[in-house]
């Protein structure tokens, strides 16, 4: 996680576009870490609701789509600037949804059972 923050800060100084590709990956790693700790704290695996699992899978799909959109923007920007503009707007919305969904997922997990 420390390496990811250092890498993100370095890229942020260079260009904000690349940082937007890295930030969802850092959120993805942070969520995986907190959810794995949540599972380890449970005495009986049968008591875990399937709801966090469904949120986890949907979150992963959104993160990967967001990263793919950002990579495609960089590729389009190199090839043709006019192609880049509509995809840039769409991926910015997707990136915003991705960040908000992370907050909702983390809020849905029981705080008393997670000790980071």
UniProtKB/Swiss-Prot annotation:
Superkingdom: Eukaryota
UniProt-annotated location(s): Membrane
A GO cellular-component term linked to this record: membrane
Topological category with respect to the lipid bilayer: Multi-pass membrane protein
Principal subcellular localization: membrane
Key words of the record: Membrane, Transmembrane, Transmembrane helix
Ranges annotated as spanning the membrane: 55-77, 87-109
Miscellaneous section: Partially overlaps SCW10.
UniProt name for this protein: Putative uncharacterized membrane protein YMR304C-A
